[in-house]
């Protein structure tokens, strides 16, 4: 069922945006699905913030779910599978600039989370070969891993009552770091996939990023690909623990996000994609690059025109 290899994120469409009708109607259109399919991709990852699918009173918003149904239809029309990623839930966001807190302690927030996924299961549980569920984007702090292991396993239990075989993706803490996959509890479910994100070496992929604290990464620091240390050997070492954990537990690995900020040169970005792709391919790791359009990482942006035809070979 879960046989995807080459994907593209639709970041900024139903997440990390102003949620205006114009944004939701026009940021991504059918033409974009056609373009992604023409690149040889086999799936898209759709980040969704709860703001799109919940009303202010926390009831389910039919209009928002209808938008996701349409996105699935557009993907299927173009021969693409789709990962639904809950990018932000009530009481939690990976983004430190967003005022959300309490999810890991608050049972009310957790029940809303379960309710969202039960709805997704009702809508798409009959499509286990084409629609996959990613429960939550980028758990941040180490202190959250114990409650998160409990929460995601309860969520899987509730989904399974409705969608018994849909592949479900689960990531660990430090923003889905590949180094923390080993802290996920082994599930008694053959259709759980271990999920991670990879923006390493961070000083290269996030150079100049305005949202990264200055004491973590000086904003004026620039790092070329040749200076970055990004080699096949580097990524082999970085992924080793996660690969071993997945083998031990009989699970597949998936990289839900990876990419390079648009401050790096297109040529350096291409070089990075070539190297990480070699390791993905060697170990059979499915992946979805960040991101299709804008969001500081867009591979369809004009600046990438000269290298895009080559880059898409290495998605």
Kindly give the residue locations of the regions a language model identified.
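Short, hinge-like loop/turn segments at secondary-structure boundaries
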Residues: 63, 100-103, 185-188, 211-213, ...
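An exposure/low-complexity boundary signal
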Residues: 59, 68, 249-269
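Aromatic-rich peripheral "rim/lid" segments of glycoside hydrolase catalytic domains that contact
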Residues: 265-315
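Active-site region of glycoside hydrolase catalytic domains
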Residues: 4, 105-232, 236-261, 275-278, ...
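Generic, ordered loop/turn and secondary-structure boundary motif
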Residues: 14, 185, 200, 298-300
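Active-site donor-binding loop signature of nucleotide-sugar glycosyltransferases
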Residues: 10, 196-198, 292
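Active-site mouth of glycoside hydrolases
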Residues: 1-167, 172-180, 191, 296, ...
């Amino acid at each position: 069922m879960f046989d995807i290899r080459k994907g593209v994120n639709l970041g900024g469409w139903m997440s990390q945006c102003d949620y205006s009708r114009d944004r939701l109607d026009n940021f991504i259109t059918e033409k974009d699905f056609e373009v992604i399919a023409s690149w040889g991709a086999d799936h898209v990852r759709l980040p969704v913030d709860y703001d799109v699918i919940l009303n202010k009173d926390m009831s389910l918003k039919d209009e928002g779910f209808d938008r996701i149904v349409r996105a699935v239809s557009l993907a299927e029309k173009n021969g693409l599978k789709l990962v639904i990623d809950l990018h932000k839930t009530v009481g939690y966001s990976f983004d430190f600039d967003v005022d959300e807190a309490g999810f890991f302690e608050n049972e009310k927030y957790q029940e809303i989370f379960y309710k969202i996924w039960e709805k997704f299961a009702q809508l798409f549980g009959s499509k286990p070969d084409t629609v996959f569920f990613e429960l939550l984007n980028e758990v941040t702090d180490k202190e959250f891993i114990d409650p998160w292991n409990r929460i995601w396993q309860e969520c899987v239990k509730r989904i399974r009552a409705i969608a018994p075989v849909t592949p479900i993706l689960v990531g660990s803490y430090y923003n889905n770091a590949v180094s923390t996959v080993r802290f996920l509890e082994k599930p008694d479910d053959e259709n759980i996939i271990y999920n991670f994100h990879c923006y390493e070496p961070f000083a290269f992929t996030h150079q100049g990023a305005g949202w990264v604290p200055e004491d973590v990464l000086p904003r004026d620091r620039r790092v070329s690909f040749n200076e970055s240390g990004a080699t096949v050997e580097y990524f082999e070492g970085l992924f080793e623990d996660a690969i071993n954990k997945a083998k031990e537990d009989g699970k597949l690995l998936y990289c839900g996000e990876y990419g390079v900020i648009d401050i790096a040169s297109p040529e350096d970005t291409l070089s990075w994609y070539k190297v990480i792709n070699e390791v993905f391919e060697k170990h059979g790791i499915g992946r979805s690059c960040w991101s299709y359009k804008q969001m500081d990482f867009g591979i369809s942006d004009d600046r990438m025109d000269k290298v895009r035809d080559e880059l898409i070979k290495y998605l």
